[in-house]
Amino acid sequence: MKEKNILVVEDDLHMRIFITTVLETSGYNATASKDGQEGIRKVKEDRPDLIILDVMMPEEGGVSMYRQLKTDNQFKNIPVVMLSGVESKTFLHSLKMMSIGLRNPLPAPEAYVEKPLKAEELLNIVQKLLAGEPLPE
């Protein structure tokens, strides 16, 4: 089986190291970016199988990168796991508000994980998304 490539976009160095280490020790090929601008560049270069994306980042934030991904036909089908300290209900509501007036509203991410992050939970989500399995609501 081909090793799956996962891009981690996270501004916090310690969290970036933690997530990439968890993924690599579980057999995934993980690369990391410190912000959305670098993340978009790596998506174009590496074509990852899945993206783990922090919502709150300075400069090119996670939501802005998410919007770029989901409105680009080349990348819109790459599964995205959003990470945030914000409750998922609050995030999904703000995503819906940002979509008002757009011809094609932004879809909800394939998964949303609240911080503090649990390695087991993240790996379970990654495994299911890469296998094309549905996630529990």
Regions found by a protein language model. Give the residues of each.
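Non-catalytic signal-transmission and effector/linker regions of two-component phosphorelay proteins
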Residues: 1-5, 120-137
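Conserved acidic carboxylate
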Residues: 10
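Charged docking surfaces used in two-component/phosphorelay signaling
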Residues: 17-25
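Helix N-cap/capping motif at the beta->alpha junctions
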Residues: 32-41, 62
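Active-site beta3 strand of CheY-like receiver
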Residues: 46-52
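Active-site residues of response regulator receiver
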Residues: 54, 84
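Receiver (REC) domain active-site loop signature in two-component systems and cognate sites
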Residues: 57, 69
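Alpha4 helix (beta4-alpha4-beta5 surface) of REC/receiver domains from two-component response regulators
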Residues: 64, 87-114, 120, 124
